[in-house]
Amino acid sequence: MKEVSIKIINQNEVAAIFKNRTDYVLKIVEDAFIKWANNEVLLPDKISQIFDQQTQNRINCMPATLLKDKVSGMKWVSVFPANALKSVPNVSGVMLLSEIKTGFPQAVIDGTLCTRMRTAAVGAVAAKYLARHHTRPTPPPAKFE
């Protein structure tokens, strides 16, 4: 029987991997968009379990598969907006990665920091491609009233 070895990567390790590597994070996100546009990604709809309509406390399950890379994964993210009032993070998550030849899990990764980095990078990549060329920021009015 084949032994399954699963790598556990905690938040400190994620931070160390990506420390001072903003360009790398942007490239990963940009490459993911390109792969999706080229139909190299299976990206089912997000499953959202909302526990309380008033608070919007929920857990989201977001699966995806990179076909050419032969890896499938799922991000499990809890969103509890009122946590901010308790001085605890309102978003936390974990990711599970499996290879798709045998389906064996390969890694469990703390997804909280990954979620933050991805969210920021999506905005930056969108700005790169959607901003008008040769534009400058509008200066503030000379006088505020």
Segment roles from a protein language model:
Residues 123, 133-145:
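Glycine-rich adenosine-cofactor-binding loop
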Residues 1-118, 122-124:
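N-terminal ligand-binding/catalytic initiation module
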Residues 128-131:
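Glycine- and Gly-Pro-enriched alpha-helical subdomains that act as flexible
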